Swiss-Prot record:
Keywords: Ribonucleoprotein, Ribosomal protein, RNA-binding, rRNA-binding. InterPro entries: Ribosomal_uS19, Ribosomal_uS19_CS, Ribosomal_uS19_euk/arc, Ribosomal_uS19_SF. It holds the Pfam family Ribosomal_S19. GO terms for biological process: ribosomal small subunit assembly; translation. Protein S19 forms a complex with S13 that binds strongly to the 16S ribosomal RNA. GO terms for cellular component: cytosolic small ribosomal subunit. This is Small ribosomal subunit protein uS19. Belongs to the universal ribosomal protein uS19 family. The gene is rps19. It comes from Halorubrum lacusprofundi (strain ATCC 49239 / DSM 5036 / JCM 8891 / ACAM 34). PROSITE patterns: RIBOSOMAL_S19.
Length: 141
């Protein structure tokens, strides 16, 4: 994967609601909040919590070269992804373990927790002996 995030997957210039990635990264958090969907906008307008402020400061003070090697570990699944997060690797806690999330421009406006689910999909096997009425007559081998 290339480290140039200005072009999207199809080779077109990335734009979020009519703004390029460079324009978004130059904007203030309050200006970006006006472009976000309602739920994310509301969480920013009401004020980020102290833990979210700490995470934002950690991202701002971090070296871009060390992000892939040392991801930022966080439990904040409800943190909206801002343009400043593009290119940063997070380890997001899903209730069981920390899962890596490499932030790409297409993720702007979503929450960190949306990219690693807390529940795994259940794939049931065959029913056991006696589990259903019809399985009572299956030979035991």
């Amino acid at each position: 994967m290339s480290s140039d995030y200005r072009t999207g997957r199809e080779g077109k210039e990335f734009a979020y609601r009519g703004h390029s990635l460079d324009e978004l990264q130059e904007m203030d958090v309050d200006e970006v909040a006006e472009l976000l969907p309602a739920r994310q906008r509301r969480s920013i307008v009401r004020g980020l919590g102290t833990e979210q402020q700490k995470l934002l400061e950690k991202v701002r003070s971090r070296d871009k070269e060390t992000t892939a090697d040392n991801p930022i570990r966080t439990h904040l699944r409800d943190m909206p992804i801002l343009p400043e997060f593009v290119g940063v690797t997070f380890s997001v806690y899903n209730g069981h373990s920390f899962e890596r999330v490499q932030v790409e421009p297409e993720m702007i406006g979503h929450f960190l927790g949306e990219f690693h689910l807390t529940r795994s999909t259940v794939e049931h096997g065959q029913a056991g002996i006696g589990a259903t009425r019809s399985s009572k007559f299956v030979p035991l081998k």
